[in-house]
Amino acid sequence: MGKGTPSLGKRHNKSHTLCNRCGRRSFHVQKKTCSSCGYPAAKMRSHNWALKAKRRRTTGTGRMAYLKHVTRRFKNGFQTGVAKAQTPSA
């Protein structure tokens, strides 16, 4: 039997399973690495030749629960909620 159509029916073992970090079915069972995000490496896997993939998973594509408000707080000088001391006017 060759490596073509007849042999494809005999393939039934999964080489990839779900990844804990990205949730895709890209975690290689034997290598123990994710082909999509690079888990368990500390840094996320990203390549310049995959610009579309970068765009899909970059900052701003999720909830941004904290970052959403940083620009507004920056404009106001990161106020802490404590009133400024009154300076006597001349």
From Swiss-Prot:
GO terms for biological process: translation. It is found in: Cytoplasm. HAMAP family: Ribosomal_eL37 (MF_00547). Disulfide bonds: none annotated. It comes from Candida albicans (strain SC5314 / ATCC MYA-2876). Belongs to the eukaryotic ribosomal protein eL37 family. Keywords: Cytoplasm, Metal-binding, Ribonucleoprotein, Ribosomal protein, RNA-binding, rRNA-binding, Zinc, Zinc-finger. Its cofactor is Zn(2+). GO terms for cellular component: cytosolic large ribosomal subunit. One of its GO terms (molecular function) is zinc ion binding. A zinc finger (A20-type) spans 13-46. Component of the large ribosomal subunit. Mature ribosomes consist of a small (40S) and a large (60S) subunit. The 40S subunit contains about 32 different proteins and 1 molecule of RNA (18S). The 60S subunit contains 45 different proteins and 3 molecules of RNA (25S, 5.8S and 5S). This is Large ribosomal subunit protein eL37. InterPro entries: Ribosomal_eL37, Ribosomal_eL37/eL43, Ribosomal_eL37_CS, Ribosomal_zn-bd. Component of the ribosome, a large ribonucleoprotein complex responsible for the synthesis of proteins in the cell. The small ribosomal subunit (SSU) binds messenger RNAs (mRNAs) and translates the encoded message by selecting cognate aminoacyl-transfer RNA (tRNA) molecules. The large subunit (LSU) contains the ribosomal catalytic site termed the peptidyl transferase center (PTC), which catalyzes the formation of peptide bonds, thereby polymerizing the amino acids delivered by tRNAs into a polypeptide chain. Pfam families: Ribosomal_L37e (PF01907). PANTHER family: 60S RIBOSOMAL PROTEIN L37, RIBOSOMAL PROTEIN L37. Zn(2+) binds at residues 19, 22, 34, 37.
